[in-house]
Structure formats: structure tokens, C-alpha cells
Amino acid sequence: MKNTILILFTAFIALLGFFGMSAEALADPKADPLAGPNPDADPEAINLKAIAALARNY
């Protein structure tokens, strides 16, 4: 049972990679693919912007 779930999960991830879907595209499917990252859908982008703002202040 555990092996079956692992195989299905791996196949699902492989299909996502095959069709070029990234984690951000899954998080914000209505986003324009040519636009920059959406900070509302990508919490990592918010952290990078905050770190960059702190670095500029020092």
C-alpha cells in the first residue's frame, strides 16, 4: 500500500513537471505567465523583498 501511494505521488509530480507547471502556477493559476511573481501567491517573494529592503537600509 505504501509503495502504491509513493508510485502514484511520484507519477503525479512527474506529470506536473512534464507539463511545465511550477509551484507558483499551482498557487496562483490565474496569474499571467509573462508577468513577474505575485507576492500574494508566493510567500518566499515577500521574504526576499523584506530582506532586500533591510539590506538597503544598512
Curated annotation (Swiss-Prot):
**Propeptide segment residues:** 28-45
Name one cellular component (GO) term. Answer: extracellular region
What keywords does the record list, in alphabetical order? Antibiotic, Antimicrobial, Fungicide, Immunity, Innate immunity, Repeat, Secreted, Signal
Q: Which residues form the signal peptide?
A: 1-27
Q: Where are the AXPX repeats?
A: 27-30, 31-34, 35-38, 41-44
Q: Does the keyword Repeat apply?
A: yes
UniProt tissue specificity: Expressed by the venom gland.
Name the GO terms of the biological process aspect: defense response to bacterium; defense response to fungus; innate immune response; killing of cells of another organism
Task: Classify the main location.
Answer: secreted
State the protein's name: Mastoparan-VT7
Q: Please name the source species.
A: Vespa tropica
